Amino acid sequence: MNFFFFTIFLLISFSTNSMNLFNKSLSNSEEFFTEWEYISDNVMGGVSSGKATILKDTDNFFLRLEGNVSTKNNGGFIQVRSSKEIVSDNFKGIKLKVSGKPSEYYIHIRTKFLLMPWQYYAGKFSVDKEWKYVEVYFEDFKKSNFYQPSAFSATDIKSVGFVAYGKDFEAELNIMEAELF
């Protein structure tokens, strides 16, 4: 009996501190998109186009953000975004399992202190054709405007978006896993 409690204690002690950002299963597209929404620069007059879909790679489902990002008409983004409520400050960044068309992509975080829709914090990462893990630390996120607070904590986060942004290109970002760590 003591061995059982000791084993449980060890498992709890050595468990990683993480939070899955894909609360809804990727295997159920309809349910998943009740939490995550596709948004483009069309909301502000831009001409980028794209979509977010759920696909399957062998045995694993993943989210794909794809489309044509255009900087015409002051645009230049497509994204998939979800509101989040994070109750712990014990996180230091976001870890993703990604692949896609080789390019730079972004994580956009909005906090409860950002009131205007063009305000966010951006964390940059690169993808390749092969699946890989990337970690983007909160301390490496850049604020979009000079008048924003310089830093944020996990409990300040209001939404998380995965974004193809800032240049004219054909985007294809695949995300199999997304978690706070």
Regions found by a protein language model. Give the residues of each.
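Beta-rich carbohydrate-recognition modules and glycan-binding surfaces
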Residues: T16-F181
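Hydrophobic h-region of N-terminal signal peptides that target proteins for export
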Residues: F9-N17
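Sec-dependent signal peptide recognition
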Residues: M1-I8
